Amino acid sequence: SKTMLLVEDNLELRFFLRSIFISNFNVIEAVNGAEGLDKALKFVPDIIISDIMMPEKDGITMTEDLRANMATSHIPVVLLTAKTDMDSKLEGMELGVEDYITKPFSATYLKARVENILTQRVKLQQLYCANLMNIQPVAEEEQQTQPEMSSHDRKFMEKLTELMEKNMDNGDLIVDDLVQELAVSRSVFFKKLKTLTGLAPIEFIKEMRVKRAAQLIESGDYNMTQIAYMVGINDPRYFSKCFKQRFGMTPTEYKENAKNKR
């Protein structure tokens, strides 16, 4: 199940929030922004709900710290506030806060907002997967309705894609090689990649390889054995199997299909 971090100094409100989400989430609690940041780094939750006004570190400062850290920059944050003033709202929105909810709020509304945010995340994963290797350019009007990715997350994905490009023909590439190059911990890498693309690292590597293979087949410049080696899958039968799993047809059928489309 998904993990939620609640950051709230008021015991009653924290208890109320916990009661709303405990049936659907593994709920972790923190009493101020400093503890919230520590727990976010330790548990890397799927979503954070935080108050703004808190001792030691307020919600806005905590969000700034979360956004500045590669390990937590992808986590959606919902801020709760008693303040209706526009300044803190704008400040929150500039940080890429997913939502801003003014107290008092209804449990139903908060629940619906959280569901909506996590659904948007899944859309972002699907979009990102479709666009790995730039296979399907996104239409401009579609782009405007897409959820935004933070600059940290974009950098992470760009660097990862670049590493895959460089190592495409390296059949010995393993997940640890990517982790080392990206200079993050293994657990952060797994969680971040899964959050951003919906794929586990091994699936991601395979996805990149077969998508590149599809591009090479479409180019018509190479035979299947050459293509298999170029994408680092040195066993032609295994190559055919991976390809069929992804595209629902063998590489040869895909080639025929591509020819007919021209």
Regions found by a protein language model. Name each.
Residues 54:
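Receiver (REC) domain active-site loop signature in two-component systems and cognate sites
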Residues 29-47:
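Acidic, metal-coordinating helix/loop segments flanking the phosphotransfer/catalytic sites
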Residues 15-19:
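Charged docking surfaces used in two-component/phosphorelay signaling
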Residues 195-234, 257-262:
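Terminal helix-turn-helix DNA-binding modules in bacterial transcription factors
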Residues 175-204, 230-250:
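Basic/polar phosphate-binding segments, predominantly the helix-turn-helix DNA-binding elements
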Residues 105-114, 118, 126:
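C-terminal output helix
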